[in-house]
Amino acid sequence: MRKLKTLVFGAMAGALAFTTQAKAEWPEKPIQFIIPFGGGADVEGRMIAKAMSKVLGQPVVPVSKIGGGGAIAYTYVKNSKPDGYTIAWNSTSILTTTNIGNVPFDYTALDHIGQVAQQPVPFVVSAKARWNTLKEFMDECKAKPNTLKIAFAGFGSATHMAGVALTNGMDCKPIMLPVKGADRRKMILSGETDAAVDIFFVPLKMVKAGKSKFLAISSGKRNPAAPNIPTAKELGVDMEFDLFRGLSVAKGTPQAIKDKLEAAMIKAASSKKFSGRMKKLKITLAPMGQKQFAAKLKKANTNIVSIMKKAGIYRAKAKK
């Protein structure tokens, strides 16, 4: 009996040593980096993936899985093996798409590594548009409900939610149009849409080129890249909404691997090349690890659920 116990404990110790060694050696092969959107998400995602490849010593390979306001990408990562070899390039959409009914789970169905950067969501119109302030646009929208068109990235996306918060907060009832990023900007210029809610850095180029103008931004503070543009809160809308980007993995990924990913993410985000590129794009670099990001997600999720409930678009998860 004593011999059997010795063999069992010996086997357990050997297995533990093997597992510890495997974690220590991670990563031993390329890592899939799942990107849920095109446009700015794709640009930023490929940049951080490349920077992380250098830190980890293995290829971090961008893979586009676009659709459902991030639902396809997050579902894919949720269902992946929890070994750290499949990473989601998350954004605020991890909170919006999970609360609007695009997926049957909430944001806690994945493990979250941390945040890389954040940016405000601007309300954009053509430079030729008749509105020069957000109030002018919203006053017309209230006077003519279901007439003015506002384009956004897709149902459940961060731009969708920012648009809902803004219009609902000012009693505006527009026609909301789900449109891809590049097409959204073309439609602004052609007049096919009256306005758009968008990521920050791409339309900022159009503003500087004199083709578009921002009427407001969603964040709690003015952005130094566009200091003359008021926040929605300054204009009387009770909202603070940032588009963040970071990393998530399958639930149950070993803590040792998550810690390695966090360290690699922060080191890559802080690298001279990546941080310089972010500065050039006017994106706020704001890396944070698992604990700080968990607190941010919890607070942001409460805010988003409140926005959705007020707008009547919140979808509770079915109890198991």
Predicted regions and their residues:
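Bacterial N-terminal signal peptides that target proteins for export
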Residues: 1-9
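C-terminal segment of classical bacterial N-terminal signal peptides
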Residues: 14-23
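N-terminal (or domain-start) structured segment
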Residues: 23-109, 147, 159, 167-195, ...
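Hinge/capping helix and adjacent helix->loop/strand transition within the periplasmic-binding protein
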Residues: 25, 52-54, 76-85, 98-183, ...
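An extracytoplasmic/periplasmic, membrane-proximal ligand-sensing/linker region
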Residues: 28-30, 168-172, 255-320
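Short coil/turn segments
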Residues: 36-40, 92, 126-131, 152-157, ...
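C-terminal lobe and pocket-closing loops
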Residues: 118, 202-270, 299-302, 316-320
